[in-house]
């Protein structure tokens, strides 16, 4: 139908064109008509072909560009393309315009972020990540890349903000430090790089160290001044810590040191003397003594040292007050101990007179009696105060529990084996050897109890006299071996006479003479070893013997001359004087001549032979000899007991009062 219409129209076109050609004189045939149709169709075809080529080229360009944009944008989804070329072209144009707009937006965003990253990186001194560009455009502006750039930018912003705050904080601190140190320097430029912040921190630490050093020095100066004056010093110096202020503080301290140097020196020397005096009185060993250095040897004498000295002195004064009279008794004990050793050494190197062994014997008895009394007093004191007394760094109780070894000890190997040879009761004592050796005498401890207590004066001796450190050998006696062995056993047990009472109590003795009062005797169970040779040089500096207070004695009950010596002494062993009661004077004062005779007789009599086994005939003979001096039985009893106590009477009337040797 359509072809028929086209054929009709072509016939009409042919007829019309033929008519017109005839009018014009042109020849027009069907061939011409066909050529015209073909030429028109050919031209139209060429136009279409050109158009198609153009459209295809455009489509290709669009496709390639779209593909590149999709790649840069990271788009992987496929698009639907129409079949016709014109539709394809239009679709590509539309899609290209859309994707190009997206690309341009992301490109601008990426460029802005990258520029900011570059700027912050330069400020912070950080490295910039390389970004690939193609003809000025980003090669990759996908969402992932944009997220990375955004994260990097946020990180740099955070670092920048922190460093900015740190920089401001450091500069504020620097300003304060500079003001405190009176330093006027221009602040460094803002440099937020790591090195810049590091330099600021180093500079700040230097200023802070300088400030702390100066502040600590000022504090030391203030504390030292406070220790000197005892209160916070008031000063009008500036409150900053500049070099000038520090110099002013140093000058202030130097001037105050000069003022307090004399004060501290005087106070230190006074307190040092007081402390050393108390330390010697309290028997503190030299190793344990404090504050022994001279003032010039101490690098820094301050108020704290003075206070510590006062505290130590206060402690010693409290201890001295608590010990009371016990301290004097301890001193007498140590000094008498040194005198015993000195006398024993003197007798060992000298050929002394007949009175020398007797003097040493009296000293030894004094020592044992004083030691026994000191043990009793020390035990009571320790129980009351619940603490121990230390002498030269060691407990006094352990020192007293050591038995004193007499300076003259009989050599048992040289004792005569003549057991039956005994002197007659009326005969004089055997002769003593004096050819370079010590006489054969035994110093024994006597446990005697008296009715009356006595007051003991202080006896002083040189602190350089050493203690007994060993047993001193002596020449053998001419008496029997059996008696000598018995005497040795009695000596080692600590008493001259055996104590028949079962109690081991320690009692003070009652009688005395001008040679001093007698102290309680140490019972055999009180100690077990010899006194060590230690600490004697720790005693007070050398002092001379001085006169002492005298003590009055009471008269004892009369005893018949026929009674044995043991029976005369026995009442003394069972009586204890009332506490705090002092003895009275003698009832019957013998004549001076009789006293002298009795003294010489008692000194020459060998009292070492007296024991519980002594015969009654010997005792009676001695009493008869004493009776020959026209003395009463009461006087004889007194003389015997006084001499057994280690005392004797002098020839003058004032000798009725006991004094130390």
UniProtKB/Swiss-Prot annotation:
Query: Single Gene Ontology BP term?
Result: meiotic cell cycle
Q: Record's PANTHER family?
A: FASCETTO-RELATED, PROTEIN REGULATOR OF CYTOKINESIS 1 PRC1-RELATED
Gene symbol of the encoding locus = mcp1
Q: Name one GO molecular function term.
A: microtubule binding
Ranges of compositional bias, category Polar residues = 472-481, 548-562, 582-592
Q: Name one GO cellular component term.
A: microtubule cytoskeleton
Keyword Signal appears in the UniProt entry: no
Comp. bias intervals (Low complexity): 414-430
The entry's keywords: Coiled coil, Meiosis
**Native species of this protein?**
Schizosaccharomyces pombe (strain 972 / ATCC 24843) (Fission yeast)
> Which parts of the chain span the membrane according to its record?
none
Q: What is this protein called?
A: Meiotic coiled-coil protein 1
- Segments for region (Disordered): 410-446, 467-562, 573-592
Q: Where in this chain does the entry annotate a coiled-coil region? A: 38-78, 100-121, 143-184, 304-320, 360-387
Q: Where is the composition biased (Basic and acidic residues)?
A: 436-445
């Amino acid at each position: 139908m359509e072809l028929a219409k086209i054929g009709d129209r072509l016939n009409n076109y042919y007829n019309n064109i033929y008519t017109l050609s005839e009018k014009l004189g042109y020849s027009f045939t069907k061939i011409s008509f066909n050529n015209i149709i073909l030429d028109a169709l050919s031209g139209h075809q060429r136009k279409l072909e050109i158009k198609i080529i153009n459209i295809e080229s455009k489509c290709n360009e669009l496709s390639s560009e779209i593909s590149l944009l999709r790649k840069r944008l990271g788009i992987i989804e496929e698009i639907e393309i129409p079949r016709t070329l014109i539709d394809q072209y239009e679709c590509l144009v539309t899609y290209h315009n859309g994707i190009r707009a997206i690309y341009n937006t992301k490109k601008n965003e990426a460029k802005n972020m990258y520029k900011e990253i570059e700027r912050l990186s330069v400020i912070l001194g950080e490295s910039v990540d390389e970004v690939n560009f193609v003809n000025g455009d980003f090669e990759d502006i996908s969402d992932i890349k944009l997220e990375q750039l955004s994260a990097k930018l946020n990180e740099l912003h955070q670092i920048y903000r922190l460093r900015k705050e740190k920089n401001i904080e450091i500069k504020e601190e620097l300003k304060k430090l500079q003001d405190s140190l009176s330093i006027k320097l221009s602040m460094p430029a803002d440099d937020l790089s790591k090195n810049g912040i590091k330099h600021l921190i180093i500079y700040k630490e230097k200023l802070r160290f300088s400030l702390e050093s100066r502040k600590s020095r000022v504090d030391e100066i203030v504390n030292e001044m406070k220790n000197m004056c005892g209160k916070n010093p008031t000063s009008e110096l500036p409150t900053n810590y500049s070099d000038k202020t520090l110099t002013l503080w140093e000058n202030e301290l130097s001037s105050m040191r000069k003022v307090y140097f004399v004060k501290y020196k005087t106070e230190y020397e006074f307190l040092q003397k007081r402390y050393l005096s108390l330390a010697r009185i309290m028997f503190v060993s030299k190793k344990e003594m404090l504050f022994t250095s001279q003032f010039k040897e101490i690098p820094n004498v301050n108020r704290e040292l003075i206070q510590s000295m006062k505290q130590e002195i206060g402690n010693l004064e409290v201890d001295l007050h608590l010990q009371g009279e016990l301290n004097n008794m301890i001193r007498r004990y140590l000094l008498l101990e040194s005198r015993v050793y000195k006398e024993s050494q003197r007798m060992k190197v000298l050929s002394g007179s007949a009175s020398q062994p007797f003097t040493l014997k009296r000293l030894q008895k004094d020592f044992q009696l004083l030691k026994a009394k000191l043990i009793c007093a020390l035990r009571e004191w320790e129980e009351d105060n619940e603490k121990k007394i230390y002498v030269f760094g060691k407990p006094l109780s352990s020192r007293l529990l050591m038995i004193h070894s007499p300076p003259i000890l009989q050599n048992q190997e040289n004792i005569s084996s003549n057991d039956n040879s005994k002197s007659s009761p009326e005969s004089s004592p055997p002769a003593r050897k004096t050819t370079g050796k010590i006489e054969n005498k035994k110093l024994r401890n006597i446990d005697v109890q008296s009715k009356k207590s006595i007051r003991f004066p202080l006896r002083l001796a040189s602190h350089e006299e050493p203690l007994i450190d060993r047993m001193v050998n002596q020449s053998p006696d001419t008496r029997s071996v059996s008696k000598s062995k018995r005497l040795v056993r009695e000596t080692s047990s600590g008493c001259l006479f055996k104590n028949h009472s079962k109690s081991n109590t320690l009692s003070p003795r009652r009688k005395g003479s001008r040679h001093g009062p007698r102290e309680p005797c140490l019972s055999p169970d009180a100690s077990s070893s010899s006194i060590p040779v230690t600490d004697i040089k720790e005693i007070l500096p050398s002092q001379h013997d001085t006169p002492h207070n005298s003590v009055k004695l009471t008269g004892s009950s009369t005893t018949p001359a026929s009674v044995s010596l043991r029976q005369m002494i026995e009442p003394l062993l069972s009586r204890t004087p009332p506490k705090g009661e002092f003895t009275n004077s003698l009832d019957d004062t013998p004549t001076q001549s009789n006293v002298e005779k009795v003294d010489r007789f008692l000194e020459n009599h060998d009292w070492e032979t007296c024991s519980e086994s002594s015969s009654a005939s010997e005792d009676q003979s001695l009493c008869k000899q004493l009776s020959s001096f026209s003395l009463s039985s009461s006087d004889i009893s007194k003389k015997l007991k006084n001499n057994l106590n280690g005392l004797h009477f002098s020839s003058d009337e004032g000798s009725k009062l006991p004094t130390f040797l």
